[in-house]
């Protein structure tokens, strides 16, 4: 399972499988991560567990009418905080993303809002701001509005949602997607019967628990696909069970259904009536390539591109190619892919270095592309047979230390520090001490010089080594390349304008190209990679697993099944994967096609 990432421990989030001569691996990453432990900021599994516990307690109190809610104060100028507007994407929608900021875990709201804003960046221009900064009529300025309710208001936490937002949702004809908490406060604010008459259900009688328990909801069914929901014990805040009003009230469309493994009970996971789409949980924690987040990724089309044509494309890239690679293996891969008329990407590291001789009998070794003519010839052969050159870091390792494995190219992180803990988890320690815009640019400049010195074209695409870097680094990459193809990290402070907190972040993968909150086009990598052996507490990932993830992603009406493969593995597993994905109806395209 790919877990979520909230600072500290990388339980696979944001990292792509390692290569190198010894081929250790960091499994491919996920979307919000719950760390096994966290940094001094307090982010990690403890916070997610505490948040879910508070949610369960508040839900029981609300059911017992013991959770008084203090309404939001009238807005004042001092309440307004900076909003972040991403560049306009290919389509023309305009999107407002509102999020919570108060309570002991208020910072989660910004992380979830970034995940929502990034997905919305596939469709057009995105503006994100705290819900407390909402002003009357704002919903009318956008094609659609998304509210991510992550703070369960009540008791000692006053409602931060302005009354104007509740009223505007009720009166606007514009689509509103409400995710998670506080829809019951809207019903109380506008009148329960008024809410029922428009939407056909009663949030004030809808709860996350049944008979005192949130149950064991482990799957969501959407558009014929069974998606997983794997929440660790003690970390599940539940899925809201909407109380549908029935006869005499508007019909409610049940868009997705959740199943409780312990009872077999089925409840709506997402519903729609009138202008309101409601999703019964925030789907960004504990996700995988076949997770219920896939349903949410498709639901955005209903609000932002309802006329989108069904289209299913696939993409494969060959990973961790360096001056130390075997040119015969590269040509073998090129011949197979060319025989199948499959365009593909080649992620190339321009400098191979083994600073302590880990794989060279103790003798340090460094090889540039210019010093590896056979590899360069193989790369040119690949480019002539359907490949697109991509830049995968400068050295794909850091200094002469284990980070976290060997210090050798393709094994280790380059732009983030890490270590492996006693439980065999990869722990994300944060950016290097010398991290800065200038430092990142110096490595990019050196990498590009390495390609030029070998007579290769300048790559237009970038993939961060193991996907992990600081916010400043990601922006540098975006300034030097047409697009990034990866599963990035997004740090607290990016939306709010506060200093970026390197210990609090969310990792995310995408089923389609997006304009992210860093202002860069990010191309999808969403079904992972072939990995024949378990590593760092993650199971092997075989062709059948990749194919199953591609099948789940058929639920996204214009989605991409994007994966990567290391050329030091045999051709057969790659062939099995490609054949299986093609059999599902996917068409393989090149990386530059993914932006369209």
Q: Would you name each region that the model predicts?
A:
Residues 32-38, 42-142, 310, 337, ...:
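Aromatic-Pro/Gly-enriched surface loop or interdomain linker
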Residues 104-185, 356:
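Helical hinge/lid and interdomain linker segments adjacent to catalytic or ligand-binding clefts
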Residues 124-130, 298-310, 328, 332-355, ...:
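C-terminal domain-boundary segment and adjacent tail
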Residues 151-231:
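A glycine-rich, often tryptophan-bearing local segment used as a flexible ligand/cofactor-contacting loop or short
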Residues 184, 343-470, 527, 560-563:
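Metal-dependent polysaccharide deacetylase catalytic core of the NodB/CE4 family, i.e.
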Residues 209-274:
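Catalytic beta-strand/loop cores that center a nucleophilic Ser/Cys/Thr
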Residues 313-322, 327, 438-441, 445-461, ...:
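Catalytic grooves of carbohydrate-active enzymes
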Residues 426-514, 569, 573:
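Catalytic domains of cell-wall/extracellular-matrix polysaccharide-remodeling enzymes
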């Amino acid at each position: 399972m790919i877990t979520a990432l909230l600072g500290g421990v990388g339980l696979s989030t944001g990292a792509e499988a390692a290569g190198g001569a010894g081929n250790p691996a960091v499994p491919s990453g996920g979307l919000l991560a719950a760390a096994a432990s966290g940094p001094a900021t307090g982010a990690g599994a403890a916070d997610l567990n505490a948040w879910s516990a508070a949610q369960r307690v508040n839900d029981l109190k609300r059911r017992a009418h013991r959770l008084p809610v203090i309404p939001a104060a009238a807005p004042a100028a001092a309440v307004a905080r900076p909003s972040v507007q991403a560049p306009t994407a290919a389509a023309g929608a305009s999107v407002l993303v509102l999020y919570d900021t108060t309570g002991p875990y208020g910072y989660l709201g910004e992380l979830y809002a970034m995940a929502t804003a990034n997905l919305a960046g596939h469709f057009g221009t995105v503006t994100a701001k705290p819900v407390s900064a909402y002003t009357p009529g704002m919903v009318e300025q956008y094609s659609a509005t998304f509210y991510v309710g992550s703070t369960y208001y009540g008791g000692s936490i006053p409602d931060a949602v302005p009354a104007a937002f509740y009223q505007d949702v009720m009166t606007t004809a514009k689509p509103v997607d409400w995710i998670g908490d506080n829809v019951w406060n809207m019903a109380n604010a506008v009148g329960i019967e008024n809410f029922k008459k428009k939407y056909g259900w009663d949030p004030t009688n809808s709860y996350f628990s049944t008979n005192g328990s949130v149950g064991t909801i482990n799957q969501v069914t959407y558009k014929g696909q069974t998606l997983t929901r794997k929440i660790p014990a003690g970390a599940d805040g539940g899925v809201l069970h909407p109380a549908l009003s029935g006869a005499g009230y508007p019909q409610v469309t049940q868009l997705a259904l959740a199943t409780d493994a312990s009872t077999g009970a089925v409840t709506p996971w997402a519903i729609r009536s009138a202008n309101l789409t409601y999703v019964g949980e925030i789907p960004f924690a504990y996700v995988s390539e076949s997770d219920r987040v896939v349903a949410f990724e498709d639901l955005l089309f209903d609000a932002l591109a309802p006329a989108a044509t069904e289209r299913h494309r696939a993409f494969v890239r060959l990973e961790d190619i360096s001056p130390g690679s075997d040119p015969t293996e590269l040509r073998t891969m090129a011949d197979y892919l060319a025989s199948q008329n499959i365009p593909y990407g080649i992620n190339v590291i321009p400098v191979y270095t083994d600073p302590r001789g880990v794989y060279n009998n103790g003798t340090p070794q460094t090889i540039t592309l210019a010093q590896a003519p056979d590899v360069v010839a193989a790369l040119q052969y690949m480019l002539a047979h359907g490949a697109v050159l991509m830049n995968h870091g400068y050295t794909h390792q850091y200094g002469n230390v284990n980070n976290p494995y060997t210090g050798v190219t393709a094994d280790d992180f380059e732009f983030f520090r890490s270590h492996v803990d006693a439980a065999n988890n990869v722990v994300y320690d944060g950016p290097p001490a010398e991290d800065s815009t200038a430092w990142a640019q110096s490595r990019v400049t050196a990498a590009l010089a390495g390609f030029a010195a070998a007579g290769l074209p300048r790559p237009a695409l970038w993939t961060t080594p193991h996907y992990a870097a600081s916010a400043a680094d990601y922006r540098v990459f975006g300034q030097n390349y047409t697009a990034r193809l990866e599963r990035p990290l997004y740090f607290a402070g990016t939306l709010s304008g506060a200093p970026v907190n390197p210990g609090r972040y969310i990792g995310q993968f995408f089923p389609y190209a997006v304009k992210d909150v860093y202002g860069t086009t990010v191309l999808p990598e969403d079904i992972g990679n072939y990995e024949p052996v378990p590593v760092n507490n993650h199971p092997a990932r075989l062709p059948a697993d990749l194919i199953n993830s591609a099948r789940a992603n058929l639920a996204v009406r214009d989605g991409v099944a994007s994966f990567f493969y290391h050329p030091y593995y045999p051709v057969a597993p790659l062939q099995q994967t490609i054949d299986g994905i093609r059999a599902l109806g996917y068409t393989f395209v090149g990386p530059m096609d993914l932006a369209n």
